[in-house]
Amino acid sequence: MSSHTEYNSIGRAKEGSTDVWITPLYVVEFAQNRWNEGNPFDLDAAADADNKQAPVFIGEDTDALSVDWAEHYIEAIIDDPSFTDLNCENVWLNPPYGRQMPKFLQKAYEEVQAGSVDRVVCLIACRTDTKVFHDLIFSNASEVWFIKGRLSFSGKGSANFASCFVVFDKRRENNSIAINYGPVKEEIE
């Protein structure tokens, strides 16, 4: 049994939860260009069929906090001849934005530390005063990218909070963290 309290993959306690923020395509494209050489992510670790940002995703019917993400990926593609690489290297994560967000970030870090995946790029609400920033992100992330302005999430309009990318990468050097900032739209145009 996982040490995490069980949540479905997009953290919904009930239909229509306010924890679900669907990522705008330009944000995903920016992340793909910056951290994945323009390639699509292998796995979206918190999605549903309507908002997935990778060909394979962990949906509402699976507890994303208790499954091995690389194993989930392999099980999803093993019989599909269009996939030639069984490695789940780059994961996209726009976790639920409620109390379970720190649990998803901890899981992302654990997946990288265990060697299951190479990199997890997370889009989160930028709340640098929180415990998760001080205890997990600042001491373990390879990069934090503070996004200029507020994002407009699909179906929700502009967020009432700042956003940032947090990247956990197995290639992190010297236990250092890169801090960057800027717009995401201009970077991909």
Model-derived regions: residue spans:
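Class I S-adenosyl-L-methionine-dependent methyltransferase catalytic core
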Residues: 1-189
